């Protein structure tokens, strides 16, 4: 495993972490809250983002416009079934969702989940580091000094990505606490 492939894998972990925490409800309307909701339409299960456009009509309200107006009730049912603590309101060919202000208990729970997810991401990054270091030690074509130098660079990458994860988690926690 080269330095660039290690960086690519670590970057993938960071991207996954960003996507995971984007879905945490902070009290502000954001399409990421519902875009992964699955909906039963046309005899199959599809993601909401594949069958409708999701927009923010104001800071606490989402507007979902299905590409096929016949899917409005299925979308409403899908949102309710997702247990997101969101109440869809069907208005003709659209669905509105008023995003409630999170309760203190909900905020504490989300912050706990956020910390768990950030720790899982950091563990994944450290596992990539361990795998790289193990492969370096097994590579007979490298000198001991070369191995030490590469291990140091891999550690620097690990520190960089762990710090980015911590920063994202702090930002999200501040966003949750400031509501």
Curated annotation (Swiss-Prot):
The keyword Manganese does not apply. It comes from Chlamydia muridarum (strain MoPn / Nigg). One of its GO terms (molecular function) is ribosomal large subunit binding. Its main location: cytoplasm. It is found in: Cytoplasm. CDD domains: RRF (cd00520). Keywords: Cytoplasm, Protein biosynthesis. Gene3D superfamilies: 3.30.1360.40, Ribosome-recycling factor. InterPro entries: Ribosome_recyc_fac, Ribosome_recyc_fac_dom, RRF_sf. Belongs to the RRF family. It holds the Pfam family RRF. Responsible for the release of ribosomes from messenger RNA at the termination of protein biosynthesis. May increase the efficiency of translation by recycling ribosomes from one round of translation to another. It comes from the Bacteria. This is Ribosome-recycling factor. The keyword Cytoplasm applies. Disulfide bonds: none annotated. One of its GO terms (biological process) is translational termination. GO terms for cellular component: cytoplasm.
């Amino acid at each position: 495993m080269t330095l660039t492939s290690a960086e690519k894998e670590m970057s993938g972990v960071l991207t996954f972490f960003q996507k995971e925490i984007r879905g945490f409800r902070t009290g502000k309307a954001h399409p990421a809250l519902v875009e992964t909701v699955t909906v039963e339409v046309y005899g199959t299960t599809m993601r909401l983002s594949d069958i409708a456009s999701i927009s923010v009509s104001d800071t606490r309200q989402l507007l979902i416009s299905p590409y096929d107006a016949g899917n409005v009730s299925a979308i409403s049912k899908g949102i309710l079934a997702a247990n997101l603590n969101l109440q869809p309101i069907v208005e003709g060919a659209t669905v509105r969702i008023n995003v409630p202000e999170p309760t203190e208990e909900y905020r504490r729970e989300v912050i706990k989940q956020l910390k768990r997810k950030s720790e899982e991401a950091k563990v994944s990054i450290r596992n990539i580091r361990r795998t790289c270091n193990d492969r370096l030690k097994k590579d007979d074509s490298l000198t001991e000094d070369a191995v030490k130098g590469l291990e140091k660079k891999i550690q620097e990458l690990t520190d960089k990505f762990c710090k980015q994860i911590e920063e994202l988690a702090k930002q999200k926690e501040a966003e949750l606490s400031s509501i």
